[in-house]
């Protein structure tokens, strides 16, 4: 299955939630009506109350799209999360948050996770002084993330830094915007992550 490259607004409207797929402080512009279903009759169509299974499936799709994960890879993350001690749902979120592309995005070096994925794939990111071009690379506590010297002047990185400077930096990261370096201080706890994610629905879905 190929990675989705169509309109990001359509995905947000399908899930009825902001998936943070667009750059900027507000990830959706005024043209993207999140509560309106996509399609010709989206404006007049009503979002039906789904079944229990439908709600679980939608939540899984929402989280997959937020982090840009394909179905097969998402299942592998869930399997790994279920094998670890503690809450499977929280373990799953931790694994997703520790992805290198997500950390690059959280540090403000990219405006979106998709953009962060490109930076990693194009060998613009270093971990502990070594180039890493695998977006799914799992970042560990105290790992040092930096932008390669030749990539520092990219306009998209400068724009991302400008935008990130207007928002609150996650407490589990220590970022120096002048040197374009950051430290992954600790794995974020559940209360430090978005509250609108209902990971328990995914656990219920895969537990059947």
From Swiss-Prot:
Keywords: Ribonucleoprotein, Ribosomal protein, RNA-binding, rRNA-binding. The keyword RNA-binding applies. One of its GO terms (molecular function) is structural constituent of ribosome. The keyword rRNA-binding applies. Gene3D superfamilies: Ribosomal Protein S4 Delta 41, Chain A, domain 1, RNA-binding S4 domain. It comes from the Bacteria. GO terms for biological process: ribosomal small subunit biogenesis; translation. Coiled coil: none annotated. Signal peptide: none annotated. GO terms for cellular component: small ribosomal subunit. Residues 98-160 form the S4 RNA-binding domain. One of the primary rRNA binding proteins, it binds directly to 16S rRNA where it nucleates assembly of the body of the 30S subunit. With S5 and S12 plays an important role in translational accuracy. Belongs to the universal ribosomal protein uS4 family. Part of the 30S ribosomal subunit. Contacts protein S5. The interaction surface between S4 and S5 is involved in control of translational fidelity. This is Small ribosomal subunit protein uS4. The gene is rpsD.
């Amino acid at each position: 299955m190929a990675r989705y490259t169509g309109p990001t607004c359509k995905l947000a409207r399908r899930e009825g939630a902001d998936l943070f797929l667009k750059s900027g402080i507000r990830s959706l512009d005024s043209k993207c009506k999140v509560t309106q279903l996509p399609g010709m009759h989206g404006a007049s169509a009503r979002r039906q109350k789904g079944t229990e299974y439908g709600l679980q499936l939608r939540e899984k799709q929402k989280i997959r799209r937020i982090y840009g994960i394909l179905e097969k890879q998402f299942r592998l993350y869930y399997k790994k999360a279920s094998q670890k001690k503690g809450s499977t749902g929280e373990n799953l979120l931790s694994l997703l948050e520790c992805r290198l592309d997500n950390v690059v995005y959280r540090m403000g070096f990219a405006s979106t996770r998709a953009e962060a994925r490109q930076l990693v794939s194009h060998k613009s990111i270093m971990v502990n002084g070594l180039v890493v071009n695998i977006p799914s690379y799992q970042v560990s506590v105290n790992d040092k993330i930096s932008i390669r010297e030749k990539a520092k002047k990219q306009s998209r990185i400068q724009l991302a830094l400008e935008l990130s400077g207007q928002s609150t930096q996650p407490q589990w990261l220590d970022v120096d915007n002048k040197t374009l370096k950051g430290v992954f201080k600790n794995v974020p706890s559940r209360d430090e992550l978005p509250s609108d994610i209902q990971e328990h629905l995914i656990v219920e879905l895969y537990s059947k």
